[in-house]
């Protein structure tokens, strides 16, 4: 009789701990931790462009200053991509270039798709 009570109590404790873990998971998943969520909002950068303008004005460049990276280059199409680990730079041929997401394509595949789109084939 005692062993059945111990088993029942053990099963009840196990069930309660699993339920507690589940509720904590859903609470965090759906934003229940309001104090933590509020803390994230106070750490966000301002949504105005003042910080960018300050960096732009403080950059010394006697050539072309790339707007996306603030790199100083000879020509606009020489601007590097802001995120080269996930973007490919494709030169369009008229002295301009675009940075596009690699998106899991094979090397050169994104550039090929842009060329097909420019020709109206895609």
UniProtKB/Swiss-Prot annotation:
Cleavable signal peptide: 1-21
Function: Probable component of the endoplasmic reticulum-associated degradation (ERAD) pathway.
Family affiliation: Belongs to the LCL2 family.
Annotated keywords: Signal
Statement: the UniProt record of this protein carries the keyword Ribonucleoprotein: no
Top-rank lineage group of the source organism: Eukaryota
Taxonomic path: Eukaryota, Fungi, Dikarya, Ascomycota, Pezizomycotina
One GO term of the biological process aspect: ERAD pathway
Name by which UniProt lists this protein: Long chronological lifespan protein 2
């Amino acid at each position: 009789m005692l062993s059945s009570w111990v088993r029942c109590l053990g099963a009840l404790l196990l069930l309660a701990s699993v339920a507690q873990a589940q509720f904590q998971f859903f609470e965090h998943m759906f934003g229940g931790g309001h104090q933590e969520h509020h803390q994230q909002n106070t750490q966000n950068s301002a949504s105005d462009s003042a910080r960018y303008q300050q960096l732009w004005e403080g950059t010394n460049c006697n050539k072309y200053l790339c707007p996306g990276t603030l790199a100083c280059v000879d020509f606009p199409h020489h601007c590097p991509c802001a995120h080269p680990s996930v973007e490919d730079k494709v030169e369009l041929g008229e002295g301009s270039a675009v940075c596009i997401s690699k998106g899991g394509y094979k090397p050169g595949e994104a550039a090929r798709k842009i060329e097909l789109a420019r020709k109206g084939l895609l």
